């Protein structure tokens, strides 16, 4: 059995946790977990501060946030067989979540700190934490197993208040550490570190505002695999994917892979005010990403590059909200062939191995286009600090994907188009003596518009095609209905020793997915949370 290397996450936390804790106290944000299905901010800030929908951290300075926060304990369970081949069959999770905003004399601050602990069941084919992020270079076993996933996630935003009566400056920082470990042979361990920094500025010229922010991000995913109990490790194989069913096989014995990713971007914002309660805001944000894949001893099977952009437009007039966005990205992977070279240092006699590239060629391309437009009506009552009086809206989302493995002739390709109409609404149904009951719901139906699928005759071995690509195609092109609802109850707590009154809350969220074309298929999510509003 191979002794594990020291835990990157633990060592990094020991160095960074004091700083994270200090910043968290400053912005009134404690411990937390991110549970997407039930993260319902008690202030609907984005409905009334349109700049919060942009990527610019000066959004905190343009409109001052309330001195408030939320701390909660959350749990969720996700189950059902309507999921992609490299996703987990079942996920049980719990954690803490705390975030808050604070207005100081020169600055407006916002911060969030999350911790989550997840148990994944029946997962196979990929030990990558996010196997569907575009990069085709994936690693995994065909043997289903259970995984443990820990995530520490920290975010902070700082913005000046208005300077010289015409400008704001701000900065944002995101930092996370993840540990994704398989609990059975072949035992893989994936460790990830991600950080992003976003400086921003905005200027006011009468009824116009112009903003600009830059973004730089770095991440590193390190995957290791070994066999601990079997005497014959050759019975465990790793499948190293290259895109659309192409793969190679490696015995799972002391395997290592590192994927480093760099992402740079910018965002330009423009706002025009038509009056005290009518605003038009647009944002254009291009980006570029590069992934470098490296195996043991510096061998490189390939790399992945991606570029794209997003245009966002929001209009607010009174209680009406209209939002639209259009985004696109194109990615390509290179297949690299190398040879090993053994070098001996003449003075020390030490022998080392390095890899030299013989040739490289484009092997895989991916194109993605998404668009959405929607209209909503939101009624806010200042007597209801924990939500809107009521809201209703609809939107339509369109998505088009086209993946090709161009190393083969003819090429392998998979293209699909989907459209999803949404209808949602909710509000406060009870508000009396500090007690509030809020209900929100959503109804969505995905319709597949087209499905073009072609596999090259050059693909001889079809293990990944039959077990990953074809099942994923069925999931990605199936029509389905999704219904979700959230119930949230807020109640007063006894006054503190300083006389300050806080509120507690509890919430229940549920989401159900029904697939008419696949008998018995579905995906269900149930989540609960209990916490304090402060």
Residue ranges of model-derived segments:
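Outer-envelope beta-barrel architecture signal
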Residues: 67-71, 105-111, 165-169, 206-210, ...
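N-terminal, post-signal peptide beta-strand-biased segments of exported outer-membrane/organellar beta-barrel
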Residues: 34-123, 135
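Residue-level signature of outer-membrane beta-barrel architecture
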Residues: 102-104, 160-162, 201-205, 270-274, ...
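Outer-membrane beta-barrel "beta-signal"
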Residues: 522-534
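Extracellular/periplasm-exposed beta-strand and loop segments of Gram-negative cell-envelope proteins
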Residues: 83-89, 121-129, 138-148, 184-190, ...
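Transmembrane beta-strands of outer-membrane beta-barrel pores
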Residues: 75-81, 115-119, 162, 175-179, ...
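Outer-membrane beta-barrel transmembrane strands
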Residues: 87-94, 146-163, 168, 190-191, ...
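Surface-exposed extracellular loop regions of Gram-negative outer-membrane beta-barrel proteins
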Residues: 159-183, 194-198, 279-296, 389-399
């Amino acid at each position: 059995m191979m002794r594990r290397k020291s835990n990157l996450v633990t060592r990094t936390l020991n160095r960074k946790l004091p700083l994270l804790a200090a910043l968290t106290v400053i912005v009134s944000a404690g411990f937390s977990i991110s549970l997407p299905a039930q993260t319902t901010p008690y202030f609907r800030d984005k409905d009334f501060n349109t700049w919060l929908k942009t990527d610019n951290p000066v959004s905190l300075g343009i409109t001052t946030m309330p001195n408030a926060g939320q701390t909660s304990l959350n749990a969720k369970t996700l189950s059902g067989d309507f999921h992609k081949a490299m996703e987990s069959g079942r996920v049980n999770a719990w954690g803490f979540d705390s975030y808050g905003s604070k207005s100081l004399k020169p600055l407006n601050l916002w911060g969030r700190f999350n911790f989550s602990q997840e148990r994944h069941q029946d997962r196979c084919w990929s030990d990558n934490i996010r196997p569907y992020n575009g990069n085709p270079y994936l690693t995994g076993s065909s043997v289903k197993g259970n995984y443990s996933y820990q995530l520490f996630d920290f975010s902070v935003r700082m913005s000046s208040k208005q300077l010289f009566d015409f400008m704001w400056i701000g900065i944002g920082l995101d930092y996370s550490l993840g540990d994704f470990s398989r609990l059975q042979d072949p035992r893989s361990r994936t460790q990830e570190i991600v950080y992003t920094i976003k400086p921003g500025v905005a200027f006011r010229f009468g009824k116009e505002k112009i903003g600009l922010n830059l973004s730089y991000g770095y991440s590193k995913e390190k995957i290791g695999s070994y066999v601990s109990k079997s005497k014959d490790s050759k019975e465990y194989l790793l499948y190293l994917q290259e895109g659309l069913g192409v793969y190679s096989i490696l015995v799972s014995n002391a395997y290592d892979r590192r994927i480093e990713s760099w992402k740079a971007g910018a965002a330009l914002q423009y706002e025009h005010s038509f009056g005290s309660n009518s605003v038009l805001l647009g944002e254009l944000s291009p980006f570029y990403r590069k992934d470098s894949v490296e195996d043991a001893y510096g061998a490189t099977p390939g790399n992945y590059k991606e570029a794209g952009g997003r245009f966002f437009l929001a209009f607010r007039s009174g209680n009406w909200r209209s939002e639209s966005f259009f985004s696109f990205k194109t990615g390509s992977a290179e297949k690299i062939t190398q040879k090993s070279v053994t070098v001996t240092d003449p003075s020390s006699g030490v022998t080392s191995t390095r890899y030299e590239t013989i040739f490289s060629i484009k092997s895989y391309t991916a194109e993605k286009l998404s668009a959405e437009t929607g209209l909503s009506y939101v009624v806010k009552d200042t007597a209801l600090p924990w939500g809107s009086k009521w809201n209703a809206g609809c939107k339509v989302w369109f998505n088009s994907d086209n993946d090709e493995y161009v190393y083969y002739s003819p090429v392998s390709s998979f293209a699909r188009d989907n459209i999803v109409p949404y209808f949602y609404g909710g509000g406060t149904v009870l508000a009396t003596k500090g007690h509030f009951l809020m209900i929100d719901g959503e109804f969505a139906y995905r319709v597949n518009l087209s499905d073009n699928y072609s596999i090259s005759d050059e693909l001889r071995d079809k293990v990944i095609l039959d077990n990953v690509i074809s099942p994923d195609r069925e999931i990605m092109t199936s029509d389905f209905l999704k219904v979700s609802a959230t119930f949230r109850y807020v109640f007063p707590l006894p006054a503190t020793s300083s006389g300050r009154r806080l509120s507690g809350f509890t919430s229940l969220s549920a989401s159900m997915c029904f697939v008419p074309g696949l008998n018995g298929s579905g995906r269900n999510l149930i989540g609960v949370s209990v916490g304090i509003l402060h």
